[in-house]
Amino acid sequence: MSASVPADLRNLRACLLCSLVKSVESFQKEGCENCEDVLHLKGDEEKVYDCTSANYDGMIAAMSNNESWVCKWQKMQRKVKGMYAISVSGVLPNNIVSELKSLGVRYKPNQRDYSTQFKK
């Protein structure tokens, strides 16, 4: 599985849980391929804005996650192919953090790679 690569560099947002970078429209249409099981962004515009941030630094194109030293360095081996922010600013809302906690996903703001905590 892979995420759609953004066609335009304007109006992009990064997932606050896994750092995947996509347009708002893509998050609404497809959800977050790494986090959809816990965030449920697909079809929910308000949740897309709550769980993503337009404030991020740098991007990494992850195409060979298991072979790339950059993906290993950024702990992205278990994520889908796609564009990822190097760092994301923002915090998930308290109700989302509570949901994650009830699912056994520990969330600390500004820490990378939560998505591997709930992968099977």
From Swiss-Prot:
Its main location: nucleus. The keyword Signal does not apply. One of its GO terms (biological process) is regulation of DNA-templated transcription. Keywords: Activator, Metal-binding, Nucleus, Repressor, Transcription, Transcription regulation, Zinc, Zinc-finger. GO terms for cellular component: DSIF complex. InterPro entries: RPABC4/Spt4, Spt4, Spt4/RpoE2_Znf, Spt4_sf. It comes from the Eukaryota. It comes from Caenorhabditis elegans. This is Transcription elongation factor SPT4. Belongs to the SPT4 family. Signal peptide: none annotated. SMART domains: Spt4. Interacts with spt-5 to form DSIF. DSIF interacts with RNA polymerase II and with the positive transcription elongation factor b complex (P-TEFb complex), which is composed of cdk-9 and cyclin-T (cit-1.1 or cit-1.2). Residues 1-39 are annotated as: Interaction with spt-5. A zinc finger (C4-type) spans 15-35. CDD domains: Spt4. May function as a component of the DRB sensitivity-inducing factor complex (DSIF complex), which regulates transcription elongation by RNA polymerase II. DSIF may enhance transcriptional pausing at sites proximal to the promoter, which may in turn facilitate the assembly of an elongation competent RNA polymerase II complex. It is found in: Nucleus. GO terms for molecular function: RNA polymerase II complex binding; zinc ion binding.
